[in-house]
Amino acid sequence: MNAPSSQRAPDHNPVPSTRVSTVERYDFHRVIQSYLDEAARLVNVPDHVRVILREPKNELIVHFPVRMDNGEYRLFKGYRIQHSNILGPYKGGMRYHEHASLDDFKALGAMMTWKCALMNLPFGGAKGGIKFDPRSVSRDELSRITRRFFHALGSNIGPDYDVPAPDVGTNAQTMAWAMDTYLNTVGMVKKEAAMGVVTGKPVSSGGTVGRETATGQGVVHCIAEWARRAHFKLEGKKLIVQGFGNVGSNTAVLLAAHGVSLVAVGDHTGYLYNPEGFNVHRLKQYVAQNGSIAGYANGQKISREEFFAVQADIFVPAALENQVGAPEAEALQVKLVAEGANGPCSPEGEAVLARRGIELLPDVLANAGGVTVSYYEWVQNRRSETWGIEEVEERLEKAMLDAYDRMTQFAKTHGCPNRIACYGVALQRLVQVYLDREIFP
């Protein structure tokens, strides 16, 4: 359809969920393992290496009490999955979300291993976080929760061992609290200058310029490279984005500089449509002030189903996993899907996209800009250096385009989808290390 129906749901109706309702329980970890198995058949991975990579090296679960503002104490549950460190220190974000689970973190931790290997970074994969809604607590409570969590992890993280970063529900401020906690506890005992214990910090506290926009910038580099190879002019094209946090908002702003217009947007509160295109800078500012797109005046409320049927050219899912199943993929009216989030397309949805000829830029590549610039931050911390924005952006663009080329070359050689090609490239690097080092003892 060219535009959403004029029939709107009443304002008092429940806000549509961003979760796909077609699948009762989505086994994200099993899905990631299926991608590994498919790529492994193309790369001829030794059985013992495949067995090792199917499961994380360490699974950490911590319970810790926090005093809330009302004086009561609440027990929280935190996780850290350390999937692989065969290439270097564990690396991956910390997610605060009410639906966080061990299996999801296992899937996301494994994905970080493939992502770092694809990007030729000297990191392994990890993921973690806390099962709670960060929007439900005060700033002071959030600080205490973060500090107690990182204190509970103790020496299970460190600049040479496991380096966390922001993810869903966390940001630069979260990382500043985490770093300060580590420096005043484990760092004091080890007598080390450990500013690089986390990345994604505020620039004033050891972060790097370009990190805040890095994931969105990486998505845009991939979209621009796809457009160049496809002889597809971005100027005047239309974009829809699901999720308008760090990744979604920065992707929309950066694509606007290429002449791409955002015509539909959604988040956890609902969906909005503007056929003339949103002012992405104003929308981003509104969300920063209000926490969501809810109440934004310059857009028409639409349903979730209408959002996926909006006529556009590019779709960037930048919310959570399992958002694009078969029904959503059938409804999409775009030429390209670029995964800003991790695992937004289910295997069933991806199969429909392939059948309909809609190109897919997979998460393992498309959103790897974040961890790539996190690596640059880590290097600067270790060397006591400060890089300018030009150096960071030039390095990031080259890294993204090099990885894009590795993906397309593998896909062409093996006749496989882009996602499996990314896993294949990553596996080639990992397998070689296992063959070189062999298995202890």
Where are these regions (language model features)?
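Glycine-rich phosphate/diphosphate-binding loop of Rossmann-like nucleotide-binding domains
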Residues: 199-311
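Rossmann-like adenosine-cofactor binding region
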Residues: 270-360
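Glycine-rich, N-terminal phosphate-binding loop and its surrounding beta-alpha-beta segment
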Residues: 62-134
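Flexible, glycine/charged-enriched surface loops at secondary-structure junctions
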Residues: 46-52, 120, 158-166, 191-194, ...
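Glycine/serine-rich phosphate-binding loop and adjoining beta1-alpha1 elements at the start
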Residues: 97, 117-235
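Short, Gly/Pro- and small/polar-rich lid/capping loops
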Residues: 22-63
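Adenosine-phosphate binding glycine-rich loop
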Residues: 19-27, 226-227, 331-441
